[in-house]
Amino acid sequence: MSKIILTGDRPTGRLHLGHYVGSLKRRVELQNSGEFDKIFIMIADAQALTDNADNPEKVRQNIIEVALDYLSCGLNPEKSNIFIQSQIPQLTELTFYYMNLVTVSRLQRNPTVKNEIIMRNFEASIPVGFFTYPISQTADITAFKATTVPVGEDQEPMLEQAREIVRKFNSVYGDTLVEPDILLPDNKACLRLPGTDGKAKMSKSLGNCIYLSDTPEEVKRKVMSMYTDPDHIRIEDPGKIEGNCVFTYLDAFSTPEDFAEFLPDYNNLDELKEHYRRGGLGDVKVKKFLNNVLQKQLEPIRKRRHEYEKDIPGVYEILRKGTAAAYEVAEQTLKEVKAAMKINYFDDAELIKVQSEKYSGISD
């Protein structure tokens, strides 16, 4: 069986460091590993419309932002197939068929759905498209026969429900769909990067993000205003590492080489943490180090983005070609699904032959 990856993002804004450590960086590594036969990267505009139906222009304008972020991070259209979800109509048809295999109560029990409903204040009035997201996500995954889906830990319940739908379909209609495996970030600090304000999640809507396309000045300003330990008032005071955003970001981004380059007084992050805990180390010094670490990571991303920004028609051509290739794959899967469900009437020559013989006998 071919090893195939499917992953993607909603085009509701520019991508940020949470996306980078949660999935983007790993995607590039997987792309360049040579371990996978195909990699599909989806710009999930149709899914974004489930809670932005009254603001399609927001989604429309952010297609290019996400594409630029993808390319600037190192996703290579020669190795990874980047496509736009809404331009693959087979996904909608697959979703429609899968809906018959899922109960409303099962959707209501999905922890990710419940959390997202609360976060978006949908408790009183949930859009059906948003509520059925686990089903449409299953269509996305199975259309491309994905064996591996790299996501953050918050998406685990969604992947488990996708696996349930696949098993249900195969038990009813015969082995047709591929059951995907989840691939979580291997750095535990990357599982969910907090916002710069200390909130549990970096979120575009909360305004607590450091964007991949931020200027050096913007990054520095955001780092220097980061939430730390509110009780660490004086330099000599002992400080807390737990819940301290600056150290969480250092867990995710810093390397021993960074210490040698930017903070040679310490050999590694453990030494820095120990000094902070016992007191005598100020937040400003730690933040300046984090700023240097992030600028080093983001500078090559910024440079690549600026190059792609010079040829926007070329970026759209990358998306057009990727979408055309994705269309062909999804069309083949849809044919297999319809054959398994016995609704491929015009392609079933045997059905037509048998019924022709049946009724020719009656007419005689």
Please identify what each model-predicted range represents.
Residues 92-96, 133-136, 156-159, 243-247, ...:
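Non-catalytic, well-ordered alpha-helical scaffold segments
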Residues 23-30, 162-165, 249:
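Buried hydrophobic packing segments
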Residues 163-364:
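Conserved nucleotide- and phosphate/pyrophosphate-binding catalytic cores
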Residues 2-139, 257, 296-298, 306:
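N-terminal Rossmann-like or analogous alpha/beta NTP/dinucleotide-binding catalytic cores
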Residues 113-115, 119-169, 173, 194-197:
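Internal, conserved structured core segments that host functional sites
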